[in-house]
């Protein structure tokens, strides 16, 4: 058996310890991660979407950040922000949640369109922009987003 196949089987075995009964979904998610694609999982709350994302992060040794999206999550929570430092007499950048390798966007369709837009920039361009300055996101960078079924309380459709 090839080394790559053994590595894939090992990763899936580790994730299966946390998530049971979703072998086809696990294989597709791993394929997307290895291809550096982004993943959108739709299902009702409480079926293990977050557990699966965290298990992949651990199995792959990726730095993971998770944001539970609600209408009050601001774009700066994702991108980071600048704060004035009086001692240095200048602004300092404080990194946001997107400065990681695997970003778990939990219940993305509960976020405002402005916050979703900040995430889309990171996904499409591999960077965040704060105060007109673009900052690269660490690579590899993969987003696993979850959404509740459209029409569930407090949700809004994601842009195409």
Question: Which ranges hold each PLM region?
Answer:
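Canonical AAA+ ATPase core
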Residues: 85-90, 107-118, 123-160
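Pre-Walker A (pre-P-loop) alpha-helix and adjacent loop at the N terminus of AAA/AAA+ ATPase modules
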Residues: 2-47
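Helical mechanochemical/support elements of P-loop NTPase systems and associated helical scaffolds
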Residues: 4-7, 11, 22-25, 48, ...
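Conserved alpha-helical scaffold flanking the Walker A/P-loop in AAA+ ATPase domains
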Residues: 28-31, 84-104
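Short loop/turn elements that form and flank the Walker-type P-loop nucleotide-binding site
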Residues: 27, 34-36, 47, 60, ...
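P-loop (Walker A) phosphate-binding loop of NTP-binding proteins
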Residues: 44, 78, 146
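Hydrophobic anchor at the beta1->P-loop junction of P-loop NTPases
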Residues: 41, 104-105
């Amino acid at each position: 058996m090839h080394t790559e196949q053994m590595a894939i089987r090992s990763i899936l075995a580790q994730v299966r310890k946390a998530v049971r009964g979703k072998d086809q979904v696990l294989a597709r998610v791993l394929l997307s991660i290895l291809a550096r694609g982004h993943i959108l999982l739709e299902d009702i709350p409480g079926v293990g979407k977050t557990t699966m994302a965290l298990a992949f992060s651990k199995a792959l040794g990726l730095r993971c950040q998770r944001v539970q999206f609600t209408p009050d999550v601001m774009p700066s929570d994702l991108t980071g922000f600048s704060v004035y430092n009086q001692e240095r007499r200048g602004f300092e950048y404080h990194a946001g949640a997107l400065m990681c390798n695997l970003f778990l966007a939990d219940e993305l369709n509960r976020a405002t369109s402005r916050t979703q837009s900040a995430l889309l920039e990171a996904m499409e361009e591999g960077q965040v922009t704060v105060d007109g300055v673009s900052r690269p996101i660490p690579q590899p960078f993969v987003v696993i987003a979850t959404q509740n079924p459209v029409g569930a309380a407090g949700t809004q459709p994601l842009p195409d």
